[in-house]
């Protein structure tokens, strides 16, 4: 395996402080650390977050991911002048292979003296609570007096909202300090322990004032002499209170002391080895194209790891991962649809954990359904740790009218329920995990199916699904949204299949499910192949969207039109019917997929970061490789592009997952259809070769393909469909793609053969 690449920050700019703090964030799924600088800047947002640690700041506030006390900040004073701002030379990079962030700066003070300041840090991959930092200072041309102040700064807030009360701060011996904090509702405790080790002849003292516990280290350096400070941090949190606070804090301190017996480099080596093993089983390599393409793939996989709480099935992946406070750290449908597939095909145990998060929160979903007059489980549109609905009731206030508009998503964007069921079936078909599907999976499928059965309304002699919002959030409160109806039917059908297969004794459910499937009316494909998005969409006027599409992601349409006006036009925020074609490819012919893509894409602004990748995958399945690659590239630039504020409040986690989706499900053509693994590869002309690992039903596959051939190596014999034809691979096989001609652009092969 070649080594993953690095991400470099080309130059220092205060305009991109928070963008790169997100892009270069570090973590391990347990905690996330923004790549803020050691020195302070007014516009800089520091951030450190623990997966699952949410708190509500007060009445009327929403549960949000808690921004912890800062441990990165360091005030560096050289000859009394505080280090900040201007730099003579600059280099900062994040090494995806090891997760280490490195910075080298040459700084000159006001009197012209020069200093090299080098810092590096990592969040441990093998000891989840551990962060290690190192900074070195070297005078270049004159002696210097150096003072470094660093420790635990508990003045950090979530944009002014304080979640933690300081319980206790202590200093132990000459090198150890600890701060203990409790959420203001008294339910969770956080212990942050620090150890600072400094080389050379130094003087040290401590201060504790205004929620800051700091160690101050001073040294006199000659020109060319280097001062090195290594800082280790151990962060524990709990919400069970099984041990006394002092006992629990002491245990945390002992863990730090054990780490302190090793150097920074020794700790880094262990973490890097953990990363190496992880990359070995997951890295995607591409030959050809621009260097950006490989970097984007490495970037995506790196962040997919650090955002995922693989250690804790009571937590899931937030819309911004653990890189910022956007969306308050809440979990959306993004997790099941855009993020879970990566884990499903690389480490199914993680996918199982993410689904068990939903299973643990079934009671809250059942209660939400009950409160709204339905049966089964209605999962919250936004969730945190408890499983309760966390979507704000109102959006931002209109400063001209003084009115707030209700947030409609939690009221009607119910497709999330079927999305979770879809993910359960994807997991079941990919792994064959009977213990899961017979217990947690069955519960999720039955309860979500019961919701749809009760959610449908009778119109004459048929059932319909009314007052919903599909993935296109610019079209609200419509009847018979195609995505919602098709996914609801799929949900109920799969629940019925599993109930029968595993001997469910609920005869009443089976009868109701059968009647639902028989009577549910489904939006019908028109003679031109287009599936209407809902009952009213086709009757609405279309407008020229060119200027809005040019500013995709900015929602500039809402500067010219109200939401109510947008709702009455053929304007899509993101893929809707095209999203359905992606989710259930076996149910649609290639001709229909192509017709939908050609009809809906010109009407789609792509104001959601979720949109372009899905269009790209469907375009690839339709053989439109130039368009598909363009969508994929534009999707990679949602965060990595030139916009200086593209991800100030955290990366777009789903768009990051979609980079993997586009390469594997788009260009490699990987999909699961009716319980079978399909590969329908079609590389863009920019790529000469694509190689990737894949997990399927207990087998580890390595797939390498180019324009003419596909090589598959497997750990055990496996059957799959290559361009629709069933093949069996044992050990390693090479196939000429010319021998596997794919009918009409590669979608719904079985259906086309039937037709």
UniProtKB/Swiss-Prot annotation:
Name of this chain's protein? Kojibiose phosphorylase
What is seen without this gene?
No visible phenotype when grown on glucose.
Q: Which gene encodes it?
A: ycjT
The record's top EC class is transferase
The protein's annotated catalytic reaction(s) are: kojibiose + phosphate = beta-D-glucose 1-phosphate + D-glucose
Q: Which residues form the active site?
A: 473 (proton donor)
Record keywords, A-Z: Carbohydrate metabolism, Glycosyltransferase, Transferase
- Enzyme Commission (EC) number: 2.4.1.230
Family, per entry: Belongs to the glycosyl hydrolase 65 family.
């Amino acid at each position: 395996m070649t080594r993953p690449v690095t991400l470099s920050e080309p130059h220092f700019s205060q305009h991109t402080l928070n963008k790169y703090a997100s892009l270069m964030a570090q973590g391990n799924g347990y905690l996330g650390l923004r790549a803020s600088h050691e020195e302070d800047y007014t516009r800089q947002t520091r951030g450190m977050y623990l997966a699952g640690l949410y708190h509500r700041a007060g009445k009327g506030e929403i549960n949000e991911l808690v921004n912890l006390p800062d441990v990165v900040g360091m005030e560096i004073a050289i000859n009394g002048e505080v280090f900040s701002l201007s730099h003579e030379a600059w280099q900062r990079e994040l090494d995806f292979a090891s997760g280490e962030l490195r910075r080298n700066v040459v700084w000159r003070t006001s009197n012209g003296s020069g200093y090299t300041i080098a810092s590096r840090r990592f969040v441990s991959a093998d000891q989840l609570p551990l962060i290690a930092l190192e900074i070195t200072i070297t005078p270049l041309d004159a002696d210097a007096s150096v003072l470094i102040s660093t420790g635990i700064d508990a003045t950090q807030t979530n944009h002014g909202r304080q979640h933690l009360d300081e319980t206790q701060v202590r200093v132990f011996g000459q090198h150890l300090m600890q701060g203990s904090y409790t959420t203001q509702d008294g339910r969770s405790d956080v212990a942050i322990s620090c150890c600072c080790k400094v080389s050379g002849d130094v003087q040290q003292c401590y201060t504790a004032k205004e929620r800051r516990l700091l160690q101050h280290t001073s040294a006199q350096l000659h020109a060319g002499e280097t001062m090195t400070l290594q800082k280790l941090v151990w962060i524990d949190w709990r919400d069970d209170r099984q041990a006394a606070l002092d006992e629990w804090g002491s245990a945390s301190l002992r863990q730090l002391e054990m780490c302190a017996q090793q150097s920074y480099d020794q700790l880094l080596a262990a973490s890097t080895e953990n990363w190496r093993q992880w990359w070995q089983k997951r890295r995607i390599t591409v030959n050809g194209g621009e260097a950006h393409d490989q970097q984007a793939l490495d970037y995506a996989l790196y962040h997919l790891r650090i955002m995922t709480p693989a250690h804790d099935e009571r937590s899931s992946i937030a819309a911004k991962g653990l890189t910022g406070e956007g969306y308050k750290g809440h979990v959306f449908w993004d997790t099941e649809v855009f993020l879970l597939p990566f884990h499903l095909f690389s480490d199914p145990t993680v996918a199982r954990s993410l689904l068990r998060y939903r299973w643990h929160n079934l009671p809250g979903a059942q209660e939400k359904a009950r409160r709204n007059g339905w049966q089964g489980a209605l999962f919250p549109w936004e969730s945190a740790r408890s499983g309760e609905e966390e979507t704000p009731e109102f959006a931002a206030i209109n400063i001209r009218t003084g009115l707030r508009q209700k947030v409609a998503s939690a009221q009607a964007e119910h497709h999330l329920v079927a999305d979770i069921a879809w993910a359960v079936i994807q997991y079941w078909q990919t792994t064959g995990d009977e213990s899961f599907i017979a217990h947690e999976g069955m519960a999720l499928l039955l309860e979500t199916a019961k919701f749809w059965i009760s959610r449908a309304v009778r119109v004459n002699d048929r059932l319909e699904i009314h007052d919903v919002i599909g993935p296109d959030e610019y079209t609200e409160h419509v009847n018979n949204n195609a995505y919602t109806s098709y996914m609801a039917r799929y949900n109920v059908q799969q629940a019925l299949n599993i109930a029968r297969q595993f001997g469910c004794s609920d005869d009443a459910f089976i009868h109701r499910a059968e009647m639902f499937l028989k009577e549910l009316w489904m939006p019908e494909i028109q003679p031109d192949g287009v599936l209407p998005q809902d009952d009213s969409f086709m009757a609405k006027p279309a407008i020229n969207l060119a200027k809005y599409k040019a500013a995709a992601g900015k929602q500039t349409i809402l500067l010219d039109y109200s939401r109510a006006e947008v709702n009455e036009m053929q304007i899509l925020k993101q893929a809707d019917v095209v999203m359905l074609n992606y989710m259930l490819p076996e149910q649609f012919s290639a001709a229909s997929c192509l017709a939908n893509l050609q009809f809906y894409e010109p009407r789609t602004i792509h104001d959601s970061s979720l949109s372009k990748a899905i269009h790209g995958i469907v375009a690839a399945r339709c053989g439109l490789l130039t368009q598909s690659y363009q969508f994929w590239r534009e999707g990679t630039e949602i965060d990595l592009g030139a916009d200086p504020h593209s991800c100030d409040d955290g990366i777009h986690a789903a768009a990051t997952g979609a980079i993997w989706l586009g390469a594997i499900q788009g260009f490699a053509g990987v999909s699961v259809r009716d319980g079978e693994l399909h590969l329908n590869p079609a590389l863009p002309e920019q790529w000469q070769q694509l190689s990737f690992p894949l997990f399927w039903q207990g087998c580890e596959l390595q797939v390498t393909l180019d324009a003419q051939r596909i090589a598959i190596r497997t750990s055990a014999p496996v059957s799959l469909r290559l361009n629709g034809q069933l093949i069996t691979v044992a050990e390693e096989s090479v196939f000429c793609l010319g021998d596997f001609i794919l009918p009409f652009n590669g979608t719904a092969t079985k259906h086309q053969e039937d037709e």
